[in-house]
Design a protein with these regions (language model features):
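Macrodomain-like recognition of ADP-ribose-binding/processing modules
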Residues: 1-130
Length: 130
């Protein structure tokens, strides 16, 4: 069984942890966790997915800020998980991606992270789904 690590929702990552947040397909990080990612963790404007600075973007909305379908978010989550598995030396602080501005339910998003490796800290609000 995998060791799961959870952090308090809305808490801050520890020094060195990579801030994983929900973005939009335009890479305009203007609100919610995306804004924090841009202002505090080096997320680059115009980059909708992947690692920049000390952050990792997972698209949850389209360019017009409409929620993406769950299957599309799930595909992006799988790409992130592959990155986390490939880099066990890194620690990832996953926010409640898709559950803020995108409006999805925790019960829909949390299970997408069931394969998360032990170097991913997940929001404690997702603990019941594992």
């Amino acid at each position: 069984m995998k060791t799961r690590t959870f952090h308090a929702d809305r808490s801050q990552p520890q020094p060195g942890e990579i801030f994983v947040f929900g973005s939009n397909q335009a890479g305009y990080h203007g609100g919610g966790a995306a804004r924090a990612a841009h202002q505090q963790y080096g997320a680059e404007w115009g980059v909708p997915e992947g690692a920049t600075g000390n952050s990792y973007a997972i698209p949850t909305c389209d360019a017009a800020i409409n929620p993406l379908p769950l299957a599309q978010i799930g595909d992006a989550v799988q790409r992130f998980l592959a990155e986390a598995v490939a880099h066990p030396e890194r620690s990832y602080f996953v926010t409640r991606i898709g559950c803020g501005i995108a409006g999805h339910r925790d019960s829909d998003i949390a299970p997408m992270f069931s394969g998360a490796p032990s170097n991913c800290s997940l929001p404690d609000t997702w603990a019941p789904y594992f």
